[in-house]
């Protein structure tokens, strides 16, 4: 069983110039926890709920809500994204993808073919595959 058989093919993504606030809106509206960052049709990074939380001002900040919103609307995804993203080929076995995810404690692997993203495989996709295989 190959990654291509279980990956999500319709990938929602953002560009490095997208604001953190806009990326957060997309993630909330689509029910996603992470987004690949694409520039000139190439994967350049990944933004997650965790990276956005780390970039957000502390709840104990003295900034007003308006100042926090201003910061989130000025900060670009490219400034806070994970740049060294683990990827997998669509021809890799599902077992190899699971191994990479477990070894590196990640819940997502962009599926890259010839430097272009062709899908994404997440922990949820792996669970669905398990259910499908086990009957």
Residues covered by each model-derived region:
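The conserved cystathionine-beta-synthase
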Residues: 14-31, 37-39, 81, 87-105, ...
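Short, charged/polar low-complexity linear motifs in solvent-exposed/disordered segments
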Residues: 31-33, 39-40, 62-64, 72-73, ...
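Tandem CBS (Bateman) regulatory domains
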Residues: 1-10, 48-85, 98-102, 122-135
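Short N-terminal signal/transit or membrane-insertion segments
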Residues: 8-17, 43
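A glycine-centered beta-loop-beta connector
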Residues: 27, 35-51, 101, 109-125
